[in-house]
Amino acid sequence: MISVSARDDSTRGPAVGYADPLGEPFLRTRFAVPARPGTFVRRPRLTAHLDQALDTPLTMVNGAAGAGKTLLVADWAAGLGQPVAWLTNEAGDQGPGMFWAYVLHALHTAGTPLPAGIGGSPEGIRMVDHRLLARLADELNGRDRPAILVLDEFDRLAAPETAEQLEFVLHHAGRGLRLILVTRTEPLLPLHRYRAAAAMTEIRNQELAFTPEEAADLLARHGLRLPAHAARALVERTGGWAAGLRLSALAAQQSTDPETYLKEFEAGHSTIADFLLAEVVGRQPPETQDLLLRVSVLDRFGPELAEALTGRPDAGPLLAGLCRQNAFVEDLGHSWYRLHPLFGEILGVHLRARSPGLEPELHRRAARWLRAHGAVPEALA
């Protein structure tokens, strides 16, 4: 159990050692603010928005894989001019005890004074003494300047109790803590309360998307100076997705005609496809992968139409879950969805390679469903 010893509250001293509750050394790379590559594009419109994080207890930067979340927050943190406690989370952490051991060490590394006597033992890494959370919150609440804590890849934390404990500390730390979550999914925190109280800063996928001007800057940093209309076309095709733009630029560097390449490249046979299939599709269970491949034959779809293509009565919850995960499934409202255009293109190629002959059958099923539901023009399209 991660615990706190009974000492006078006024005592100060080294709060954490240099080993985690299992006796292994803390991985220092997890506390380092990530370095920005030479081709990184600073985006003042987003760093200005992030400045609001200093005035709200909670900030959430929520976007898809490769949306540029981490580098954006790293750039903001590096230019802040004050200490930032940074922790990159990992999926293999063994429960809340290990998480809080790393949080304490992140705060300690950033120079945040912590109560003496906080420590951990390897017997109970899945548990946290509530007194530790209360003492930490009380210590933070008494600070003149708030501690800034960035939790990167927060979506990797699976234990619901971790979110509950984090909410307890955030609530009771008051003005002494500014928490920034960088995540692919919405955390299990009472976000509605923070929104209603105007106590939350949010940056989401739509805002993270590159503008044509930002895309042109990124391309230029890769040695590609293209006309404005070419940058706009690439942004339209990629949806302004940061990783898609960067991977396209890297590939175009090898082409004798970069402008034509960026206009006509086959997404299904590119490094973009490799990224999406590994980072998005590969992380899903087999039934969800199958659903994604099957709905890729459609421009838009709802739960019932997806059920007709997959035979799965749980198609609706699967789609809603993909949307919450920022898994390149976009909510059109009224229970209709669509795939990110580039993602849909790649899935279509993957479907034809994996299941030759299935695509025409899926089109027939979709047409039957659409006719039965009065959507004849779409069925004939």
Region locations from a protein language model:
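C-terminal boundary/linker of central alpha/beta nucleotide-binding cores
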Residues: 1-16, 58-67, 73-78, 142, ...
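Alpha-helical sensor/transducer elements of the RecA-like P-loop NTPase core
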Residues: 2-12, 16-25, 29-33, 42-46, ...
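Pre-Walker A adenine-sensing motif
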Residues: 38, 42-52
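Conserved catalytic network of the ASCE P-loop NTPase/AAA+ motor domain
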Residues: 52, 138-143, 170-176
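Short, amphipathic alpha-helical segments that act as regulatory/interfacial helices
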Residues: 58, 100, 104, 108, ...
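Conserved phosphate-binding/catalytic loops and adjacent sensor/switch elements of nucleotide-binding enzymes
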Residues: 65-67, 71-147, 156-158
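Walker B catalytic acidic pair
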Residues: 152-153
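Leucine-rich, amphipathic alpha-helical/linker segments
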Residues: 358-381
